[in-house]
């Protein structure tokens, strides 16, 4: 089914987007071998149904739990650092050949070439996707819950499972005689689009539904930065602190929408790095790769600090340095686990974070005397302590709004990208309530006694049920275990590429294979050693969060999106939008400088 794309930057209508549906069993996996032509090897191999594939309440069909898990896995794979600054598009080996991960059907830097899969025997070739006269008359229209009516094309290949005479049951199951009874069977959908440069490329269509995108967005935004929000509110005071939180939430929501508009200028753009290249060329992509590296490094360090501080508060006889060293032996093994498993483990991270917030709130209601009580709040301040602390609060209060690095990927992964703005609205409503609520509750409970991590206050305050102390420590221990490996993976991939060991040639000698595997192991261990060493030398959690917020969040979430919009949408931007973007950039540069300076000086 053709679908009209938005207007291009020069105002003309772009070519239509053609969608082609290829039947498959959704509970399938890709073969690693691109060369074979048997159905189970050249496309999709059936596997046993997981318990997650079965409908559970509202979680059924395209929103089944297995689809949520797969969508989360794709979202986690979007966090990557690109070394090839000259590459116009992130996930293309050639000008019109996208690469993807066979397990998640997500774009991947080192994935399988889409053309190889489509060009295997019995598959619609890329050149056929827009040439209906070459497609068999057996093509039919099917209906998908999210895509709507889509052209389902087959090629007249008598030896193919997708031959025109094959029944729908055969196409779905790989053989005759089996009834089409699985409600979770559908199709892989590819689309053929024309970029602003006139090149026609074939891409995988987005797969995530709106609820899945909202879930992935919340998972990106709600992190350990919210644990430092009460301290930020203490530094800024009620008046300025709450005002800054509201402004940061609104501003980052608006810039996320600007990124969405920038993506609409060219349907072949997929990632944040693609926007950087489109706006500033190779230098833009290189800058973004450097920023992403710093962001991942800072996140990994802050997780190690959180681990050490939380256990030290529970077991003060052991130093924070001791627990940081212990964290190395705990977070290093998961780095060797496949992404499919890590993605499921990462769910524990957001569950632990939200669980911690709920526990803290319950503790405040349980305790009747201050400090640590919502019934009898501590004394608080309306205005900042001093100018230095006000500047430090800038980074603390802005760090929790940084999800823009993966927002472009989340939009392009949607079945209906036009719903992305509505998803953002829901995401920011939930995130704003969580973040602002945590800041207010923490500040009321501990007032001017609040520490860099609100959990540390709870662990050091007497009067709560005994199990609370162990529970919070356990939750704070789970978060680094769940998230540190995901922060390390992109940096490890960079080291593997630099050392040319990202792929081990099985045809090489045994010595070379062992050396390559040894380097891969070394890289994974080395990154975690770096996390721990930096955490030991820079042990203050609030300073790390303030630096990430003021230095990186302002750049990635406010300055660059406005700059992208000014460059990529210059022919359609309204005058007031141009002024607003320039004002936002100027104010962000000033606030970022003040915040970074305060974090370094303090």
UniProtKB/Swiss-Prot annotation:
InterPro entries documented for this protein: AA_transpt_TM
Annotated positions of the Phosphoserine modification: 8, 15, 35, 187
UniProt modified residues of type Phosphothreonine: 181
Keywords: Amino-acid transport, Membrane, Phosphoprotein, Transmembrane, Transmembrane helix, Transport, Vacuole
Protein name from the UniProt record: Vacuolar amino acid transporter 1
GO biological process annotation, one example: vacuolar transport
Annotated Pfam families: Aa_trans
Function according to Swiss-Prot or TrEMBL: Amino acid/proton antiporter that moves various amino acids into the vacuole, with a preference for large neutral ones and histidine.
GO CC terms of this entry: fungal-type vacuole; fungal-type vacuole membrane
Reported phenotype of the disruption mutant: Decreases glutamine, tyrosine, proline, histidine, and arginine import into the vacuole.
Localization in the cell: Vacuole membrane
Family membership noted in the UniProt record: Belongs to the amino acid/polyamine transporter 2 family.
Ranges per topology, Cytoplasmic: 1-208, 262-286, 343-344, 411-429, 488-517, 565-580
Keyword Methyltransferase: no
Membrane topology, record value: Multi-pass membrane protein
Designated gene of the protein: AVT1
Note: Present with 1820 molecules/cell in log phase SD medium.
Catalytic reactions on record: L-histidine(out) + Na(+)(out) + H(+)(in) = L-histidine(in) + Na(+)(in) + H(+)(out)
Membrane-side (Vacuolar) residue stretches: 232-240, 308-321, 366-389, 451-466, 539-543, 602
Membrane spanning residue stretches: 209-231, 241-261, 287-307, 322-342, 345-365, 390-410, 430-450, 467-487, 518-538, 544-564, 581-601
GO molecular function: L-glutamine transmembrane transporter activity; L-histidine transmembrane transporter activity; L-isoleucine transmembrane transporter activity; L-tyrosine transmembrane transporter activity; neutral L-amino acid transmembrane transporter activity
């Amino acid at each position: 089914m053709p679908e009209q794309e938005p207007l291009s930057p020069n105002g003309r209508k772009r070519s239509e987007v053609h969608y082609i549906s290829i039947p498959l069993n959704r509970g399938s996996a890709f073969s690693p071998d691109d060369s074979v032509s048997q159905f189970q090897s050249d496309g999709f191999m059936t596997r046993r149904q997981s318990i997650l594939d079965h409908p559970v309440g509202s979680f059924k069909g395209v929103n089944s739990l297995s689809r949520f898990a797969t969508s989360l896995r794709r979202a986690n794979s979007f966090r990557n650092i690109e070394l090839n600054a000259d590459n116009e598009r992130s996930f293309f080996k050639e000008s019109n050949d996208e690469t993807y991960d066979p397990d998640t059907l997500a774009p991947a830097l080192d994935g399988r070439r889409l053309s190889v899969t489509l060009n295997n025997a019995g598959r619609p070739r890329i050149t056929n996707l827009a040439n209906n006269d070459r497609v068999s008359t057996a093509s039919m229209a099917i209906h998908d819950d999210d895509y709507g009516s889509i052209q389902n094309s087959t090629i007249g290949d008598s030896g193919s499972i997708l031959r025109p005479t094959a029944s729908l049951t055969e196409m779905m199951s790989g053989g005759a005689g089996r009834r089409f009874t699985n409600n979770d069977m559908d199709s892989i959908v590819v689309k053929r689009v024309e970029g602003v440069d006139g090149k026609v490329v074939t891409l995988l269509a987005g797969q995530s539904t709106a609820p899945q995108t909202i879930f992935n967005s919340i998972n990106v935004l709600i992190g350990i930065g919210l644990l430092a929000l009460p301290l930020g509110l203490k530094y800024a005071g009620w008046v300025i602190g709450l005002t800054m939180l509201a402004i940061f939430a609104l501003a980052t929501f608006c810039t996320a929408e600007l990124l969405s508009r920038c993506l609409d200028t060219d349907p072949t753009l997929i990632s944040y790095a693609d926007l950087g290249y489109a706006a500033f060329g190779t230098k833009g992509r290189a800058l973004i790769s450097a920023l992403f590296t710093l962001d991942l490094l800072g996140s990994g360090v802050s997780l190690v600090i959180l681990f050490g501080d939380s256990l030290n508060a529970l077991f003060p006889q052991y130093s924070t340095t001791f627990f940081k060293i212990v964290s190395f032996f705990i977070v290093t093994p998961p780095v060797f686990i496949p992404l499919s498993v890590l993605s499921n483990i990462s769910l524990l991270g957001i569950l632990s974070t939200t669980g911690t917030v709920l526990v803290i709130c319950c503790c405040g209601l349980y305790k009747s005397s201050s400090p640590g009580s919502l019934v009898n709040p501590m004394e608080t301040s309306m205005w900042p302590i001093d100018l230095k602390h006000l500047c430090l609060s800038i980074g603390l209060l802005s760090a929790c709004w940084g999800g823009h690095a993966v927002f472009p990927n989340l939009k392009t992964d949607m079945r209906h990208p036009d719903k992305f703005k509505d998803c953002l609205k829901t995401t920011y409503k939930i995130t704003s309530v969580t973040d602002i609520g945590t800041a207010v509750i923490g500040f009321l409970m501990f007032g001017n006694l609040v520490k860099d991590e609100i959990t540390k206050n709870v662990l050091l305050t007497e009067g709560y049920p005994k199990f609370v102390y162990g529970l919070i420590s356990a939750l704070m221990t789970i978060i680094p275990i769940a998230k540190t490996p995901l922060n390390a993976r992109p940096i490890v991939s960079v080291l593997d590429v630099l050392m040319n060991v990202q792929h081990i040639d099985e045809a090489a000698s045994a010595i070379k294979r062992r050396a390559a595997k040894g380097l891969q192991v070394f890289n994974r261990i080395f990154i975690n050693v770096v996390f721990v060493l930096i955490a030991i030398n820079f042990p203050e959690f609030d300073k790390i969060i303030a630096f990430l917020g003021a230095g990186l969040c302002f750049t990635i979430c406010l300055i660059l999106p406005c700059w992208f919009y000014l460059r990529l949408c210059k022919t359609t931007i309204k005058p007031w939008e141009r002024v607003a973007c320039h004002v936002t950039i100027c104010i962000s540069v000033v606030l970022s400088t003040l915040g970074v300076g305060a974090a370094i000086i303090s």
